[in-house]
Swiss-Prot record:
The keyword Oxidoreductase applies. The gene is dmxR10. This is Monooxygenase dmxR10. GO terms for molecular function: monooxygenase activity. Coiled coil: none annotated.
Amino acid sequence: MPGPAETQAATLAKFIEGWKTFTPEAWTETWTDDCTQNFLPFTMGVPPRTKPEVLKLLPSLLGVLHNYKLEIYSVLHDASKGKAAIYATSFADTPFGDFKWTNEYAVFLTFSEDGTQVSKLEEMVDTAFYKEFFPKFQKYMIEKGAPANH
């Protein structure tokens, strides 16, 4: 049985605040230790990531995003199922000329049994954006001598 609605709502608010802050620690603060992040659609071929994997990879990505901003359009919370959905777009400047980070998402959260943490994160991303962004990001990281995983 899912945790209390008020507890889940507080966790959801804290998750969104961490996403807006968008440091590795702030963004994953509400995640359980065994939380998985899944990129959707599956056709992107990105395997699920554990919290430690996300914490390792995120600094490379954040290093190229400047003036980051998150705009939330809709939040749906189904406390009886212990789930929430967030529709949002994030914006940032990048070092790739005039190319801007403009990533549209639908994020689906599953809460821990007690509702105090997020145990699963599924991120439906803008595939057209990623097809354009990741080659630029990978090239940039290779030029900097760093690994560029997505």
